[in-house]
């Protein structure tokens, strides 16, 4: 079944995460990394975690979001190398989108953690 709302690479969304005890939810930001064509044909969407807990020095794979306010975030935040899928219909809302500079950083982060796919052949 196709979905009507489609997100672009770099869109910042809010997802409901359950509390560790299983009662209640936390609303957390994440960034879309799946292609629109993937989303048109699937019920899920592929996301990468965003956190406002910034510890220096950053861990391997973490990247500071330079234009966090333009992305719709409330605080300075980082991209974390935690990839997950989420049911599209459960997304709460879109906050904004990463700037082109931050999208380039996201692209580099993905290459750092996933490697160069062309080199896999």
Name what the model sees in each region.
Residues 1, 5, 68-121:
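C-terminal terminal-subdomain/extension
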Residues 18-22:
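Short, charged beta-turn/beta-strand-edge "cap" motif at the junction between a beta-strand
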């Amino acid at each position: 079944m196709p979905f009507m709302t489609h997100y672009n690479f770099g869109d910042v969304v809010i997802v409901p995460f359950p509390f560790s005890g299983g009662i209640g939810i936390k609303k957390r930001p994440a960034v879309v990394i799946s292609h629109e064509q993937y989303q048109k044909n699937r019920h899920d969407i592929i996301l990468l975690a965003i956190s406002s807990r910034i510890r220096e020095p950053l861990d391997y794979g973490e990247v500071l979001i330079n234009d966090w306010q333009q992305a719709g975030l409330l605080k300075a935040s980082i991209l974390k190398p935690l990839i997950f899928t989420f049911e599209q219909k459960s997304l709460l809302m879109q906050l904004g989108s990463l700037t082109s500079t931050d999208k380039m950083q996201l692209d580099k982060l993905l290459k750092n953690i996933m490697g160069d796919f062309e080199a896999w052949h």
